[in-house]
Structures are given as structure tokens and as C-alpha cells.
Regions:
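Class I S-adenosyl-L-methionine-dependent methyltransferase catalytic core
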Residues: 1-187
Length: 187
């Protein structure tokens, strides 16, 4: 019996068209291509030499898209070991291990201070219905993870009341699609 596979694609840049295969599970929601296109248009595709943090990496789709579009470095944080192994295979296949680091841990309990690094762009696409959006913003502030004028992308469940999020970041873009809403904040 063949193993079921699912995939998502890198949609632009050096690795445009590359498939990222993964074993599907109900907690995994790779960011849709249309959503990625909107996000990177919001950023004006200006990722050249930027450092990125993909806090709930999953398949790594957002961080890989950033590398494909010129980001200098991406750190992926993912709690599921199987997804980390899958992401390692993708990095090797694309020969970009030197631009990426994978940390297999729960992003919410990780001590980000050991990275001694700030990021130009932080991707937040936490599991839905676990109340992780506010905690994620709190961690960004607590560990001072964002450079001045950096960006935070948040993808969340459609019914999350974004007005209740406490953050010093300014919401500059918003859209929605399917079961998700997504936002771009500026630091």
C-alpha cells in the first residue's frame, strides 16, 4: 500500500515550482499559494539579504519561499520531529543547508535568547485553536526578536478577534481566505 503524500509548491524565485512533499495530518495547514503570493507582494518582494524566523514552520513553506526570493537566512522552529526531518531533506535537495537552521522544539517554550539574533521578518502561522497568537507576539517582544522596522506575518483562524491582540506592532495589511485571516504588522 502506497503512503499518502501531499505537497505545496514554492511559487517564485530561484526555486519556483519546487514541490515540498509531506505526509498529511489534520494539524498541518501549509499556507496556500494565493496567500503566499499576497504576503510577498505586500513585502514588495524585498527579501534580499533579510533574515527570517519561521516560528511554527510545519512544512517550511513560508521560510522556503523567503529563501527562494533572496532571503539571506531562515531559522525554522517546528515541534514535530517528522516535519523537521522532511524539511532537512528539502534543504539538502535544494542545497541551502548553509542558509537555514532547523530547531526541533515547541516555539512557545523555546529560549530564543540563545540565538542572539534579530530578524527582519517573522512568520507566525501557529496551530489554530490553541491561543498561540498572543503568546507568540509576547515572545517576540520578550526576546526582542524583531529589528526596527521589521515585519511580522500572522496567519490565524478566521474567528480570532485581532483587536484583542496586545502588541506594539502596527497592522499595515490584512486579508482573508478559506478558514484563515492573515495580517502583516510592522515593528
Amino acid at each position: 500500500m502506497a503512503k499518502r503524500q501531499a505537497s505545496t509548491n514554492i511559487i517564485a524565485g530561484d526555486f519556483k515550482g519546487t514541490k515540498i512533499n509531506f505526509k498529511p495530518n489534520k494539524s498541518l495547514r501549509p499556507t496556500e499559494s494565493k496567500t503566499k503570493e499576497t504576503l510577498f507582494n505586500w513585502l514588495l518582494n524585498d527579501l534580499d539579504q533579510k533574515t527570517c524566523l519561521d516560528m511554527f514552520a510545519g512544512t517550511g513553506a513560508l521560510g522556503l519561499e523567503a529563501i527562494s526570493r533572496g532571503a539571506k537566512k531562515v531559522i525554522f522552529v517546528e515541534r514535530q520531529k517528522r516535519l523537521c526531518r522532511n524539511l532537512e531533506e528539502v534543504l539538502k535537495k535544494l542545497k541551502i543547508e548553509n542558509k537555514c537552521k532547523i530547531i526541533n522544539t515547541n516555539a512557545i517554550s523555546f529560549d530564543f535568547s540563545i540565538l542572539k539574533e534579530k530578524f527582519d521578518l517573522i512568520f507566525l502561522d501557529p496551530p489554530f485553536r490553541e491561543n498561540l497568537s498572543q503568546r507568540s507576539f509576547d515572545m517576540i517582544n520578550e526576546y526582542d526578536l524583531l529589528v526596527e522596522d521589521g515585519f511580522v506575518y500572522l496567519e490565524c483562524e478566521r474567528d480570532l478577534d485581532i483587536q484583542k491582540l496586545k502588541t506594539s506592532f502596527v497592522k499595515i495589511k490584512a486579508s482573508e481566505g478559506g478558514e484563515s485571516k492573515y495580517y502583516l504588522f510592522k515593528g
